[in-house]
Amino acid sequence: MDYHSPYFFGYLIGLIHLLGIIAALHAVFTVRTAQGAIAWALSLLFIPYFTLIPYLIFGARSFYAYIQARRQANQEMHVAMANLNWRPWVEEALTARESDSYAALRAMPKLGRMPCLANNEVKLLIDGEATFKAIFAAIEAARNTVLVQFFIIHDDTLGKQLQRLLLRKAAEGVQVFVLYDRVGSHALPGSYSQVLRDGGVQIQAFATRRGWFNRFQVNFRNHRKIVVVDGLRGFLGGHNVGDEYLGANPHLSPWRDTHVQIAGPVLACLQESFAEDWYWATRQLPPLILPDTYPENGVLCQALASGPADPQETCALFFLEAIHSATRRVWITSPYFIPDEAIFAALRLAVLRGVDVRVLIPSRPDHRIVYAASSLFAFEAVRAGVRMFRYQPGFLHQKVVLVDDEVSAIGSANLDNRSFRLNFEITLLTVDRAFADQVEQMLQSDFDQAREITAEDSRDTHRLQQLGMRIARLISPIL
């Protein structure tokens, strides 16, 4: 090709515009929200020079290859588990008890791919020391299988402690599987994984760029945090593996986070979620274990695994259903507050119904752009009657929802677009008065250590700061 030809740049410009038209049509048919489809289509039509590459990275909203992998994983699981017949046994033997509170969440049985199961033991783990003490104790007692999944694993003091423990269990003959997100754990050196592999631990990165059609899909993340030991003890919540989660970062310390420890039939669902992700990463299935018996009573639980491979926006719809079902209160804590229009409208409607609507967010930023966008949404929420609070002692990273007097949810999902549409998340929904009372006490303690945001805070914000907040909000759908 003659790059010096007077026609070369004309051909190049024409090609870019043609690709822009094709991408715009793709956006119209695939982007889930009307606002997003319009924004992408117009920008691709008129300024494709600047938007084609960002669209390849940020435009896709459905992880199509993972959908196919999930189908294959389910087929493989059905074959592998044919003798055990594990999931039908759980569903038939341990059906959910009658619950008016769960009945109020009318969409949940169909929204969640996993069943609501009774007779679970659930324990709150408040902050990092309690969380990792419980996780390490469970792994120490492992006899058969350990499944470990985190968004972030650091090669620091806590990370090395986990590494040594897993190596010791693998040397004892325990099957150990470790899955981490490639982007979230981008700072993890290859030597960390290699030491584990050399010691008999099966470790793999969850990467969304498998295959040619997914090579640009770097905007998806696997944000789940799951640990299951011998099918007897499970853990999920907000903590990752890093010293900062124990308060070692002076700029964010003390770190406020919440995990939950689980025993019971719902662990089958946590194992299923891990198995799907592991199958995507390795095309193999880990062993899935169920104990012979369960307690005769306990907490009603549903594991809600959500992500961009779902046929609908499971995470966003869960928040909507939870807020709409509230008759007395809905308390939410999240490190990021970037609701979409539907969630924001649901919060406003709950206020109009007389519901006590409270949202607790951090007073310190870990990501300044996200913090700026969250601040603007917080000011608008206050004007709508939502009570917004900033946690004062340190950084708040927990993801907790409390609805009325029985329903609570703890997991990895934030109240933002990334969790709604881009991340793979896991949340545990619980329906139990006694456990909800514990969650209430925990959150009330957090609110007692928070400062309520007022309308005056918005008026006192400098105009340049407000401009920065509005710019941050413009890009909030991809934050």
UniProtKB/Swiss-Prot annotation:
GO terms for cellular component: plasma membrane. One of its GO terms (biological process) is cardiolipin biosynthetic process. One of its GO terms (molecular function) is cardiolipin synthase activity. It is a multi-pass membrane protein. Its main location: membrane. The chain crosses the membrane at residues 8-28, 38-58. It is found in: Cell inner membrane. InterPro entries: Cardiolipin_synthase (IPR022924), CL_synthase_A (IPR030840), CLS_N (IPR027379), PLD-like_dom (IPR025202), PLipase_D/transphosphatidylase (IPR001736). PANTHER family: CARDIOLIPIN SYNTHASE, PHOSPHOLIPASE D. Catalyzes the reversible phosphatidyl group transfer from one phosphatidylglycerol molecule to another to form cardiolipin (CL) (diphosphatidylglycerol) and glycerol. NCBIfam families: bac_cardiolipin. This is Cardiolipin synthase A. It comes from Pseudomonas entomophila (strain L48).
